[in-house]
């Protein structure tokens, strides 16, 4: 129970269930955000949340990353690194594991470097170097930006966004958590650089944005 979390440095939570629901269009962005903010309030600074898409149980009994998340997988992987907490990786994710490993028997996976390896290297480097992603008692601040989004095509909100800030760095995460294009305005202003390509990105409340399905931005200043 939540009464025990201060006895441990880190703990699991049910976030991957909600990420799976998002990938399969069975949940709204509002429901996802409400869950994660509820978990943050319960744990506060007592305990580090483990954010993940796969564990041994999830892989063996529910499915591979492709089965569960499809094209949303890169965006949701980035989310587990950027949202407050510590990312947890399961064996084989770095090699684009695309099968269910046997649970009670020895199994293996091909160690062939694919697209996910580069993604994880970039995310890991950012996690280790940016004080905007610090966790624990002196963790970076968190502020939801999702309420600043206004969709322009009459659909329910598809955009999940938040800001994290440390003493030196400020980071903004913006994600289209939908299989459809998102057209929206964003009541937020600032000059940033995209990670990892370093391109300048200007955010303005006067702009209209279009994001591809499952597209995400990691913006730093």
Region locations from a protein language model:
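Active-site-proximal helices and loops of the catalytic beta/alpha 8
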Residues: 1-49, 79, 96-131, 136-138, ...
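Short, well-ordered loop/turn elements at secondary-structure boundaries
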Residues: 45-46, 82-85, 167-169, 212-213
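Aromatic/acidic polysaccharide-binding cleft in carbohydrate-active enzymes
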Residues: 47-115
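A residue-level signal for conserved active-site and pocket-lining positions in enzyme catalytic cores
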Residues: 56, 123, 214
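Short hydrophobic/aromatic beta-strand or adjacent loop that forms the aromatic wall/cage
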Residues: 157-159, 169, 213-218
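Asparagine-centered strand-capping/turn motif at beta-strand->loop junctions
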Residues: 173-178
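Solvent-exposed beta-hairpin/edge-strand motifs
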Residues: 187-199
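C-terminal beta-strand-rich structural cap/linker in extracellular carbohydrate-active enzymes
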Residues: 203-221
